[in-house]
Amino acid sequence: MSRDNMYYDAVVIGSGFGGSISALRLSEKGQKVLVLERGKKYSPGDFPRDVRQTDNLLWRYPKKRKSLGLYELNFFSGLGTVTASGLGGGSLIYANVHIRPDHKVFEDPRWPAPFNRSYLDPYYDKVATKFDVKPVPPEWDLPKRNKFRAAAELNQHTYFDPDEAASWLKPSRPGQSICLRCAECEFGCNHGAKNTLDFNYISDAQKNGAVFQINSLVSHIAPDPKNGYVVYYENTETGEKRSVHSKRVVLSAGTLGTNRILFNSRDKYKTLPNLSKQLGKGYSGNGDFLGGIESSKTELKPWDGPDVTTVINYFPKGFQFTMAAPTFNQPVMTVLASLGISKPNWLLRMIGPLFWKSLEWILPLVFKKGLLSKPLSPGLPGAGDPTYMTNLFAIGRDNANGKIVRRGKNIDVKWKYSKENKTLIQNMTTSMQQVGDAYGGQFGPLATFLLFNRIISVHSLGGCILASNPDKGVVSETGEVFGYKNLFIADGSTIPSSIGFHPVMTISAVAEHTAASICAGL
């Protein structure tokens, strides 16, 4: 075990939204900050496009030690998840969408005081300014946007073009370029048009002296008998185990990463034995639900524009969700169109769940063999021309009743999601069918949901939730871990309920609040 000789005022674990925000705000106060990021640095042009190169595509460390890629896929007992790995965290692969949620979201009793929409608005403002967010230019004629709006109007639902963190018509920062409308936002922007964290919060923190150290996977945290904490981590390239000391620690490893580290610290290494018994509880997938439409009567050109242009808001009609129509570049949409609209028979639906966890090795094998590198020929039932296809993505207020538990060397998520959120799923499916009808096309939910009866979430929340006391959550309203002074959490794991809107704006606003609380105590 090697020990870093440097002593820091703060060690931040993770460089996603919460970590980068924490690093900047602490560095602005003259604090000596080290950020430990497990992934690598990606510059424009570095993001993988060949899915056959699975070690570059997927994060599977330490099971596969050379697989240090961009996407981490998990097939937990209760649902599947997709998260990012790299300097900038989820900002590298999200759809750039920044939405301030409906005030009703904060009426959920799980949100402690002082959190509500008006309290968070100044923090939302900070985030919006730093990311230079703005809607897709209204003058762009985008067939996919036009049709999605028309479907909302036909079904008498409210829609809007959300703020997005992208350089539409002029670069937001030096080193960036303008959007080429290539629909590759969620694959990592190889043109530098996304206003990812490395172009704003991270670069500004670095100017203040903050150090961002990549290839550093944290295993656990322990109190330092002298002062502060010791953070233990491993170099993912060499396997060398190291430690670093600091007065305070900010955990921002993402919902799954932060829960992993705390479960390790409490249950494996026994270094944080007094963590709240609420650890792992209150997990939410933010109601993520995917579907698709084939054979629209109108040409959609789904690869023209950013991934998301418009959001339909179902909240005003009393429903607890929103919907977007994310689409991708032409090669990917062509493959997706060839998969058709799945309608597995009763036998496949019955045995499908038995094979759910096998996807952990089946899917990488499918990628490596190039089976999804080109469209299926002939296409599966319901396959159509990709020009007339779109995806649908609903985000909703699930019951946030998932439970993260320690399983072997990893974690698992226990949750009877489909049973507990049956009404939400039914309402989403009905609304998607209505959109499909408005398109004059054929709608179907994501095949994995029909086969395995499990959703796949790209918006993991909770497990270390904000609360007024340790009987209700893991961190106080300031983001400080109950029972551990100067140990803070700033990421999606602290969010105490589902949001029903794209969550990055709220995760970031709460992180700004936490950073302000930390700085106030310096």
Question: What do the predicted segments below correspond to?
Answer:
Residues 115-218, 453-456:
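Conserved redox-cofactor binding core of oxidoreductases
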Residues 1-10, 28-29, 520-522:
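Extreme N-terminal leader/targeting segments of oxidoreductases
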Residues 10-35:
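N-terminal Rossmann-like FAD-binding beta1-loop-alpha1 element of flavoenzymes
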Residues 55-138:
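Redox-cofactor-proximal catalytic regions of oxidoreductases
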Residues 28, 39-50, 207, 220-224, ...:
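Glycine-rich loop(s) and the adjacent beta-strand/alpha-helix scaffold that form part
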Residues 344-435:
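C-terminal catalytic lobe of FAD-dependent flavoproteins
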Residues 247-255, 259-380:
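Mid-to-C-terminal "cap/lid" subdomains and adjacent gly/pro-rich loops that border
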Residues 68, 181-185, 220-224, 388-396, ...:
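A glycine-rich dinucleotide-binding beta-alpha-beta segment and adjacent secondary-structure elements
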